[in-house]
């Protein structure tokens, strides 16, 4: 993997954690909604499939809540590390481009609009920022087998 691709992959970690958190929260909402509004079959026949048993419900909620807590922890540690590395860049424009792209998740045109430049300039700043960004040694060793 090329060095710039490796850096992009590293920077995208934060957005990946944000997406996972959103998905887990949506799953929790769905499970809670299903429990609050169970489907009812009005066919006049008795149904004995344990609607009063909350252990499965509680277990699935507990598992997802633990996963959510862990993912939030990973998001925070990822944010702290990535933002610290971005802040080490000398150029404020390079810092802005990386922050807006990889922390805020903005598209190129949104970054250009926010910073008052054309997209071509934003891509140039992005390339320079990636060249100046330093990755942790363990990431480089893991990816490149050094």
For each of these PLM feature ranges, what is it?
Residues 1-87, 110, 135-146:
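N-terminal interaction/assembly modules
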Residues 78-81, 92-94, 125:
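N-terminal positioning helix adjacent to the helix-turn-helix/winged-helix DNA-binding module
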Residues 82, 122-136:
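DNA major-groove recognition helices of helix-turn-helix
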Residues 89-104:
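Short amphipathic alpha helix immediately N-terminal
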Residues 98, 111-112:
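Hydrophobic positions on the alpha-helical face of helix-turn-helix-like DNA-binding modules
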Residues 116-117:
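The short coil/loop that forms the "turn" connecting the two helices of the helix-turn-helix
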């Amino acid at each position: 993997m090329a060095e710039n691709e490796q850096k992009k992959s590293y920077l995208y970690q934060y957005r990946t954690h944000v997406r996972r958190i959103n998905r887990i929260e949506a799953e929790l909402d769905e499970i809670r909604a299903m429990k609050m509004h169970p489907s009812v079959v009005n066919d006049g026949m008795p149904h004995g499939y344990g609607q009063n048993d909350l252990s499965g419900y509680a277990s699935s909620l507990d598992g997802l809540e633990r996963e959510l807590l862990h993912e939030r922890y990973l998001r925070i540690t990822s944010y702290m590390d990535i933002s610290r590395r971005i802040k080490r860049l000398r150029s404020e424009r390079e810092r802005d481009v990386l922050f807006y792209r990889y922390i805020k998740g903005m598209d190129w045109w949104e970054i250009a609009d926010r910073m008052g430049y054309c997209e071509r300039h934003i891509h140039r700043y992005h390339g320079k920022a990636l060249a100046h960004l330093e990755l942790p040694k363990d990431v480089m060793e893991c990816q490149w087998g050094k």
